[in-house]
């Protein structure tokens, strides 16, 4: 009897193309997928895939995770090659940064398996604002108008913003790199549906490629990644200026996981990030280049070409969000931070009562009077300063909690069993410091 050839799918991204939604869905339905013959590997959850990809691509950028990542790809590889089911699947956006050489290295490491590559592609007019919003949640400080200006600039010397854009949206480069690593019949492109389609459409397209009945999987327990409103994202990037010295993981657990995801994304009625005629025209041309590259690659394509259509804009320029809208976001941010500070303070007080010799009592929270903002020379600066001050205090409390009782449950929990904003937040650091691997 002939030996079985393992089948391995590599979902390589790209960034901001529904990857978090798909990863969450597959994490939540891991056992169901296993019953269908598909392994979504990782003994400790999806974070094992993050560490493994960092390992194989040699992304040694964070000292806190470096030791945990050593040998992670070898462990994940062994798990997949030993699996006796129909196929295994890895989904991790860092793979989209790979050069042709690195892509070949990844595929060669899986020698003996039939490797398929999946690339999800989304209309760039929707990706570009999402990129900037993500940037504001990863310590980014550039304003949206300046970000757009940098992307539109026709210059040989690329800005940091333009480089980030290229890494996330240079689909021709991604197809060329991975197209050299696998035969074209094993290269799959899935077009991300437009927002008007059913939420499950992306999963149904993805499931058709990996050979799964989409109806057997329940929707993710966490909602799809919501977007920050324009004012909330602007507040985040302003606060980031004052938090530039904060470590990435400390920042992610309070600013991204909690303030952004749990407080500011819950604000209703906030206007979306603005666009302009120039940006729409740029996105239209960029989408054409992606479509041409997809056709040239010979890849198996799932989706409708109209999914890459661009909604026109008549705006001649992009203006900053109105100051009052940013102040409203700051008021909600203060309320949210005061709430989490209260929760963390109570936990530290309890830990101090249980072990007064080992745990210091929590520090007193800074006082904030939002009524004074209006009387300040620069009300917005006063508001941002208060938000940053409270965020620092919340981070300090969480650091003490970790030392006292280990990883605290509840607010902004770093749950490594599923896609988490801290794990995904590493993308921001990688994209700032790595060109193409």
Language-model features and meaning:
Residues 1-437:
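Anion-recognition interface
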């Amino acid at each position: 009897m002939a030996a079985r050839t393992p089948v391995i799918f590599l979902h390589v991204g790209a960034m901001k193309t529904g990857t978090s939604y798909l990863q969450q869905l597959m994490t939540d339905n891991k056992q169901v997928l296993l019953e269908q013959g598909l392994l979504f590997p990782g003994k400790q959850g999806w974070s094992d895939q993050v560490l493994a990809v960092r390992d194989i691509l040699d992304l040694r950028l964070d000292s806190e995770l470096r030791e945990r990542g050593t040998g992670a790809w070898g462990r994940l590889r062994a798990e997949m090659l030993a699996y006796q089911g129909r196929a295994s699947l890895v989904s991790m956006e860092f793979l989209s940064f790979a050069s042709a050489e690195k892509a070949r290295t990844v595929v060669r490491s899986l020698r003996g398996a039939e490797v398929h590559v999946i690339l999800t592609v989304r209309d760039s007019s929707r990706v570009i604002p999402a990129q900037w919003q993500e940037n504001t949640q990863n310590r980014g400080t550039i304003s949206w108008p300046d970000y757009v200006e940098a992307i539109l600039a026709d210059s040989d010397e690329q800005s940091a913003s333009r480089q980030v854009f290229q890494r996330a949206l240079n689909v021709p480069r991604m197809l060329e790199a991975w197209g050299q690593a696998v035969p074209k019949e094993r290269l799959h492109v899935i077009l991300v549906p437009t927002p008007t389609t059913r939420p499950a459409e992306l999963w149904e397209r993805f499931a058709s490629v990996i050979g799964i009945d989409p109806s057997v999987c329940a929707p993710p327990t966490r909602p799809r990644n919501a977007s920050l409103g324009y004012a909330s994202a602007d507040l985040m990037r302003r606060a980031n200026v004052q938090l530039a010295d904060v470590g990435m993981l400390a920042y992610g657990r309070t600013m991204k996981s909690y303030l952004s995801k749990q407080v500011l994304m819950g604000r209703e009625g906030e206007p979306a990030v603005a666009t302009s005629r120039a940006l729409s025209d740029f996105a239209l041309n960029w989408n054409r280049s992606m479509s041409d590259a997809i056709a040239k690659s010979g890849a198996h394509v799932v989706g409708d070409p109209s999914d890459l259509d661009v909604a026109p804009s008549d705006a001649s320029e992009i203006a900053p969000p109105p100051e009052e809208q940013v102040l409203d976001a700051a008021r909600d941010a203060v309320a949210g931070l005061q709430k989490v500070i209260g929760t963390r303070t109570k936990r530290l007080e309890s830990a101090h009562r249980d072990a007064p010799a080992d745990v210091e009592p929590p520090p007193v929270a800074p006082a904030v009077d939002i009524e004074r903002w209006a009387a300040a020379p620069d009300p917005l600066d006063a508001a941002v300063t208060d938000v940053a001050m409270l965020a620092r205090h919340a981070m300090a409390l969480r650091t003490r909690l970790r030392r006292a009782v280990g990883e605290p449950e509840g607010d902004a929990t770093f749950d490594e069993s599923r896609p988490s904003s801290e794990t995904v937040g590493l993308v921001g650091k990688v994209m700032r410091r790595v060109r193409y691997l």
